[in-house]
């Protein structure tokens, strides 16, 4: 199996898809900007009265449960059902699933009632949703007991989706194919919003793609590669975050193809 990451980025930058976000208040601006940086267009509509109309214009729908409310959950379900009817891929970032009952039950409800194309979360979130011993502290992973690839496959089997587990090595699998991505830099974990931005990129790459393993691997490799490049010229968290967005904006298909560190199992 081979993955054509360069073509995935070229397709994105050619199509410039609209990516509809229903996301959290902490990182909404970061998500909008990183979507623009990669070459897509963001829209952050979450009023239940308009989300179905907005999804009809979009190439992908990103659902992020970082700052949940009853109204937002309702909007996610309405938008998700519309996306399923229109075959628009749905990306779920189950931020903090396992930390509180609301987050855990909401993530499971979205996975049960919607056909989610990609679930992207940290080890604790993915482990918890897969029924393994995933541990979450606030919205951050506090560890995972068990083999991470097996845990990801368990979640794939439960909900018929592609699963991406972020970490020092990112894992992407649809149950049959397993891709490991070794791009990234430790500084990505010490500024807020990078996990949410990765989910936004996953949505941007997913728009119009029929291969969610390839599109998700391309998104995470692109973001990790940008993080490596940003770390070389940043001297602190703030300059790193700015440099990270600049490096995402500077990515080209040849640069991604040359710099991606992927292993296929």
Curated annotation (Swiss-Prot):
Annotated metabolic or biological route of this protein: Cofactor biosynthesis; thiamine diphosphate biosynthesis; 4-methyl-5-(2-phosphoethyl)-thiazole from 5-(2-hydroxyethyl)-4-methylthiazole: step 1/1
Reaction(s) this enzyme catalyzes, per UniProt: 5-(2-hydroxyethyl)-4-methylthiazole + ATP = 4-methyl-5-(2-phosphooxyethyl)-thiazole + ADP + H(+)
Gene Ontology molecular function: any one: ATP binding
Biological process, per Gene Ontology: thiamine biosynthetic process; thiamine diphosphate biosynthetic process
Superkingdom, taxonomy of origin: Archaea
Residues engaged in binding ATP: 120, 166
InterPro entries (UniProt xref): Hyethyz_kinase (IPR000417), Ribokinase-like (IPR029056)
Regions that span the bilayer: none
Designated name of the protein: Hydroxyethylthiazole kinase
